[in-house]
Amino acid sequence: MNLANLQLFAHKKGGGSTSNGRDSQAKRLGAKAADGQTVSGGSILYRQRGTHIYPGANVGRGGDDTLFAKVEGVVRFERKGRDKKQVSVYPIAK
């Protein structure tokens, strides 16, 4: 009697898993208005997390630290002391 011992093995190894493969959406932070640009009141000037840039004249700070123009005018990015920066909006003389 001829008994065959047939054993089947996987011809490919298991795929395994990884802890990578995810990423968060970009938050589109940074300057939204350039130095010297004319903006209207309420325009967003700079989106940030924390206070990288401080609000200057005629600029407000939102709850998420976004800087926005309070009046219509020209945007100016300026130094505030030795190591800080601020953005101001100066009204256009009519």
Swiss-Prot record:
Segments carrying the region annotation (Disordered) are 11-33
What are the recorded Gene Ontology BP terms? translation
Propeptide positions: the record gives: 1-9
A Gene Ontology molecular-function term? structural constituent of ribosome
Q: Which cysteines are joined by disulfide bonds?
A: none
Is Metal-binding there in the keyword field? no
Q: Which UniProt keywords apply?
A: Ribonucleoprotein, Ribosomal protein
GO CC, one annotated term: cytosolic large ribosomal subunit
**Which modifications occur after translation, per UniProt?**
The N-terminus is cleaved by ribosomal processing cysteine protease Prp.
Q: Which domain of life is it from?
A: Bacteria
Entry's InterPro entries?
Ribosomal_bL27, Ribosomal_bL27_CS
Q: Is the Ribonucleoprotein keyword given for this protein?
A: yes
Q: Which family does it belong to?
A: Belongs to the bacterial ribosomal protein bL27 family.
PANTHER family the record matches: LARGE RIBOSOMAL SUBUNIT PROTEIN BL27M, RIBOSOMAL PROTEIN L27
Full protein name: Large ribosomal subunit protein bL27
Q: Report the source organism.
A: Streptococcus agalactiae serotype V (strain ATCC BAA-611 / 2603 V/R)
